[in-house]
Regions:
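Active/ligand-binding-proximal structured segments within catalytic/core domains
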Residues: 26-31, 136-137
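Conserved phosphate-binding loops in nucleotide/dinucleotide-binding enzymes
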Residues: 12-13, 17
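Intrinsically disordered, low-complexity basic tails/linkers immediately adjacent to helix-turn-helix/homeobox/MYB/SANT
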Residues: 8-10
Length: 168
């Protein structure tokens, strides 16, 4: 299934079986429970009780109170299609020591896409549309972008956490 993107191109969605959706949802709950405490306050995408609206409210408060002066917009081109599996597995293993969960994750990543009876396999990327995809995205971006941004700009930028507020 495809949905239109803002640039006019199409985005492929991974449509899973009902059984896979149930298991992915359960794994998403587990991963969220483990990683939610690690995610930065500035990260609002695909998180409980957070949304683009909460990010905008926080940014507005920062601008009104003069502790946020700049906004940096980050758009990772073809993000879901280019997630490195080896790094994603390392990031998950950093906090989760469950071989069964890691095996499930590997199966989902390697499942491929069937279109017109032909299965296309990939060596990278996270399928969009599955219940576990948003939390996997947040885990990957936490280590690859959020922590780097915090370390790189924390000392030179007051209100650094808000610069990433609109991610997601």
């Amino acid at each position: 299934m495809y949905i239109p993107k803002a640039n006019g191109k199409l985005r492929a969605l991974g449509i899973t079986t009902i059984e896979d959706r149930v298991v992915q949802k359960a794994v998403a709950w587990v991963l969220s429970a483990v990683f939610e405490q690690d995610f930065l306050d500035s990260s609002h995408g695909f998180r409980p009780n957070r949304s683009p609206h909460t990010a905008l409210h926080r940014l507005r408060d920062g601008m009104m109170q003069h502790w946020a002066k700049y906004v940096v917009e980050v758009d990772v081109v073809s993000y879901f299609d280019t997630v490195n599996w080896a790094w994603l597995r390392k990031f998950v293993r950093h906090r989760v020591n469950d071989g069964g969960l890691i095996r499930l994750l590997n199966k989902w990543l390697k499942a491929g896409v069937m279109e017109n009876g032909v299965v296309t396999l990939s060596a990278e990327g996270v399928p969009q549309g599955g219940p576990v995809s948003p939390v996997l995205s947040n885990i990957y971006l936490h280590y690859v972008l959020d922590l780097w941004f915090e370390r790189r700009f924390k000392k030179t930028c007051r209100g650094y956490a808000e610069l990433d507020a609109l991610r997601g």
